[in-house]
Amino acid sequence: MSKKTKQELENNKLSKRLRHAVGDAINDFNMIEPDDKIMVCLSGGKDSYALLDILRQLQASAPIDFQLVAVNLDQKQPGFPEEVLPTYLESIGVPYKIVEEDTYSTVKRVLDEGKTTCSLCSRLRRGILYRTAKELGCTKIALGHHRDDILATLFLNMFYGGKLKAMPPKLVSDNGEHIVIRPLAYVKEKDLIKYAELKQFPIIPCNLCGSQPNLQRQVIGDMLRDWDKRFPGRIESMFSALQNVVPSHLADTELFDFVGLERGQSLKHGGDLAFDSEKMPERFSDGSEEDESEIKIEPQKAERKVINILANKPKTCGS
């Protein structure tokens, strides 16, 4: 096999893997429904470009109809290349809206010099995007957070916030008017990096505001990347844990009635299981290779009727 042919094969596997990961997340959490109008938040980074690209692929083949509109918030950061996103979106024929709001000056005026601006900037941006979604008549807001973002948020909240809380794949917006979805919830960041290189997206740098990166998030990110390198399968195991929560073996009295626990009561997940050695597979699969010797993680899900976004459009007469 030639080097070129091998690379093409790898590229096809990557595209298929991403498409199926996004499709699985959409199916598992019922993210997209018939006639949805989805506002895809496009920052100019690799994640949001990939999100839009994969949703367009699914839109072309899915058995349901839904609309996509790309929205970028131009926050008037110094050096922001205003022409990049409109040029790209027009070239691929995607409806879009550029919202111009000078949040950069607001943040700089409110915060002291040298302080991390990300938190305040994020709150301002969220409010503007909610307003824009309402103006456009969108039923869903799609964000580009991926699996690594979700795990990083879990550890940030555990280490620095004292909460067992991550980033939900689907939620109701703060104002209660919109459903926010994260179709990249099952996607690995390293796959998104490869995909951006493959597709040659016109990436816009994320540090134009000059803000220092969040040190805590950087530490967590480095930790996860180190674990992924040294302990294959650990990241997959941790993400699986988010989908297999056992409240009776934690310590939150709001989630489980410890006070009302009585003798003879049968627990769904067993009572003393935490004291026994758990049977764990020697190796977890991350889904990147088709290897029958690996044990793939399949979280238990309740049966429910949802539309399979990965299915094909129904054939029409004469097709």
Curated annotation (Swiss-Prot):
One BP annotation, GO: tRNA thio-modification
Organism field: Neisseria meningitidis serogroup B (strain ATCC BAA-335 / MC58)
Protein name: tRNA-cytidine(32) 2-sulfurtransferase
Subcellular location: Cytoplasm
CDD domains the record matches: TtcA-like
Pathway field: tRNA modification
Motif (PP-loop motif): 43-48
Predominant subcellular localization, coarse grouping: cytoplasm
Record keywords, A-Z: 4Fe-4S, ATP-binding, Cytoplasm, Iron, Iron-sulfur, Magnesium, Metal-binding, Nucleotide-binding, RNA-binding, Transferase, tRNA processing, tRNA-binding
General remark: Present in outer membrane vesicle formulations which are used as vaccines in human.
Cellular component aspect of the GO annotation: cytosol
EC number: 2.8.1.-
Top-rank taxon, per record: Bacteria
Pfam annotation, one family: ATP_bind_3
Catalysed reactions, as listed in the record: cytidine(32) in tRNA + S-sulfanyl-L-cysteinyl-[cysteine desulfurase] + AH2 + ATP = 2-thiocytidine(32) in tRNA + L-cysteinyl-[cysteine desulfurase] + A + AMP + diphosphate + H(+)
Cofactor: Mg(2+); [4Fe-4S] cluster
SUBUNIT field: Homodimer.
Enzyme class: transferase
Family designation: Belongs to the TtcA family.
Function comment: Catalyzes the ATP-dependent 2-thiolation of cytidine in position 32 of tRNA, to form 2-thiocytidine (s(2)C32). The sulfur atoms are provided by the cysteine/cysteine desulfurase (IscS) system.
GO MF term (any one): magnesium ion binding
